[in-house]
Curated annotation (Swiss-Prot):
<comment type="subunit">
    <text>Homodimer. Protochlorophyllide reductase is composed of three subunits; ChlL, ChlN and ChlB.</text>
</comment>
<comment type="similarity">
    <text>Belongs to the NifH/BchL/ChlL family.</text>
</comment>
<keyword id="KW-0411">Iron-sulfur</keyword>
<keyword id="KW-0547">Nucleotide-binding</keyword>
<feature type="binding site">
    <location>
        <position position="19"/>
    </location>
    <ligand>
        <name>Mg(2+)</name>
    </ligand>
</feature>
<keyword id="KW-0479">Metal-binding</keyword>
<dbReference type="GO" id="GO:0016636">
    <property type="term" value="F:oxidoreductase activity, acting on the CH-CH group of donors, iron-sulfur protein as acceptor"/>
</dbReference>
<dbReference type="InterPro" id="IPR030655">
    <property type="entry name" value="NifH/chlL_CS"/>
</dbReference>
<dbReference type="GO" id="GO:0005524">
    <property type="term" value="F:ATP binding"/>
</dbReference>
<keyword id="KW-0408">Iron</keyword>
<dbReference type="InterPro" id="IPR005971">
    <property type="entry name" value="Protochlorophyllide_ATP-bd"/>
</dbReference>
<keyword id="KW-0004">4Fe-4S</keyword>
<feature type="binding site">
    <location>
        <begin position="185"/>
        <end position="186"/>
    </location>
    <ligand>
        <name>ATP</name>
    </ligand>
</feature>
<dbReference type="GO" id="GO:0019685">
    <property type="term" value="P:photosynthesis, dark reaction"/>
</dbReference>
<dbReference type="GO" id="GO:0036068">
    <property type="term" value="P:light-independent chlorophyll biosynthetic process"/>
</dbReference>
<dbReference type="GO" id="GO:0016730">
    <property type="term" value="F:oxidoreductase activity, acting on iron-sulfur proteins as donors"/>
</dbReference>
<dbReference type="GO" id="GO:0051539">
    <property type="term" value="F:4 iron, 4 sulfur cluster binding"/>
</dbReference>
């Protein structure tokens, strides 16, 4: 029996680098011989920018233009080929201050199923905006096998990671969803990450170093893999994403996380800042 697609949902604090991480991870998965579809789930519709080099039309825009006649839409109307052979879709979003992001994600999945697109891929990756602030934006977890949380070594990102972990736990009550683990993005230290996972046990898939080219790649509209074609010094950075891809393709058991209570986590992480490890005084 043929294995079904691995479905991943990537979450994290707003601005933490989810889309940059998602695009590089998608290319890494493609380099492992997998057919990959990345679905951007953010009203800004810029998730796939570093794969395609431009802002592709959204599914919601296309549906509106076609009067929501699904039968008039073809795969080439909504699926765009990006770098490394990664296929890209942008869900789009409702007008600012109106509508529900979860509805948009649902319509996107509905259309892709109508087009039999889900059957064409080995990996489907949902790149989801910011923190899980409502049930609507937790909607991609309804379709995912694994959640991946992008963080850094800071208080706010880990606080958001804990809230996302709570959403995973809630969704896991009714479906086979697991947390694959954390990805530390662009950080020179990991002490606060380690402090967090010691209190809230969960896997750490990888911690990427504080490399400026990771940020620059977003501005250039290129993945690290594409930049490495002309700058081989970036190949070791690409290896981090390949390592993550290998871990996810192994279909890990994952976990149902047990997030900390907000006050408990606040105390844990703030105490870390209040009582830093001091260097021994020179005599």
């Amino acid at each position: 029996m043929e294995e079904r697609a691995v479905k991943l949902a990537v979450y994290g604090k707003g601005g933490i680098g989810k889309s940059t991480t998602s695009c590089n991870l998608s290319v890494a998965l493609a380099k492992r011989g997998k057919k990959v579809l990345q679905i951007g789930c953010d009203p800004k519709h810029d998730s796939t920018f570093t794969l395609t080099g431009f802002l592709i039309p959204t599914i919601i825009d296309t549906l509106e233009a076609k009067g929501y006649h699904y039968e008039d839409i073809y795969p080439e109307d909504v699926i765009y080929r990006g770098y490394g052979g990664v296929d890209c879709v942008e869900a789009g979003g409702p007008p600012a201050g109106a509508g529900c992001g979860g509805y948009v994600v649902g319509e996107t999945v509905k259309l892709l199923k109508e087009l039999n697109a889900f059957d064409e891929y080995d990996v489907i990756l949902f790149d989801v905006l910011g923190d899980v602030v409502c049930g609507g934006f937790a909607a991609p977890l309804n379709y995912a096998d694994y959640c991946v949380i992008v963080t850094d070594n800071g208080f706010d990102a880990l606080f958001a990671a804990n809230r996302i972990a709570a959403s995973v736990r809630e969704k896991a009550k009714t479906r086979k969803l697991r947390l694959a683990g954390l990805i530390g993005n662009r950080t020179s230290k990991r002490d606060l990450i380690d402090q967090y996972v010691s209190a809230v046990p969960m896997p750490v898939l990888e911690v990427l170093p504080l490399v400026e080219d990771i940020r620059i790649s977003r501005v250039k509209g290129k993945t690290l893999f594409e930049m490495a074609e002309t700058d081989p010094s970036l190949e070791p950075v690409c290896q981090y994403y390949l390592n993550i891809a290998d871990e996810l393709l192994a279909r890990p058991e994952g976990i149902v996380p047990r997030p900390a209570e907000d006050r408990e986590l606040f105390a844990l992480l703030s105490d870390f800042y209040k009582t830093p490890v001091r260097e021994p005084a020179l005599v």
